[in-house]
């Protein structure tokens, strides 16, 4: 069974992307089948995984808008894991998906139903609580929340934990 982990925090610069790439690489070196999903419009996880954005036919942006399938979007990295790449245009998905209907938050979860051959799916989230992050939280069964060792970071962590709990309650309930 695939384990889906969202690496998330509403704050930027806390190590989400670095954690996601390093975890994907370590799991890949252990022989696990890993899919890294880059949901951040900055696309740092894509670039950091060695993927040339210029040569991409599709990205997670087109997949979320159902213009292509998950399989058409996945690219293999030289680091031993697959990548669902991002691009700057992904910021547009926030506009195109937000406010449409509640199903917009389930698009990633639905797409991942075809990714059962992976041992792990790791989702690098943007530093915001938006439709992209909500898609990750809905799709994930576990969460890694990197935080800085400071008071305000812990306050933000409590808020994020509450958001995750409410999302899971609405999915299961």
What are the functions of these language-model segments?
Residues 1-173:
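P-loop NTP-binding core
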């Amino acid at each position: 069974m695939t384990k889906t982990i969202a690496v998330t925090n509403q704050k930027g610069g806390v190590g989400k992307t670095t954690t996601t790439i390093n975890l994907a690489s370590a799991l890949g070196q252990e022989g696990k089948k890993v899919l890294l999903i880059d949901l951040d419009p900055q696309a740092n996880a894509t670039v950091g995984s060695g993927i040339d954005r210029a040569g991409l036919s599709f990205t997670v942006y087109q997949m979320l808008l159902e213009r292509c399938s998950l399989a058409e979007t996945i690219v293999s990295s030289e680091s031993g894991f697959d990548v669902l790449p991002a691009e700057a245009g992904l910021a547009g998905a926030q506009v195109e998906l937000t406010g449409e209907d509640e199903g917009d938050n389930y698009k990633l979860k639905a797409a991942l139903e075809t990714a059962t051959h992976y041992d792990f799916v790791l989702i690098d989230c943007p530093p915001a609580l938006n439709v992209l992050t909500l898609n990750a939280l809905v799709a994930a069964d576990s969460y890694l929340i990197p935080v800085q060792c400071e008071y305000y970071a812990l306050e933000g962590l409590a808020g994020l934990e509450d958001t995750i709990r409410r999302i899971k309650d609405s999915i299961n309930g």
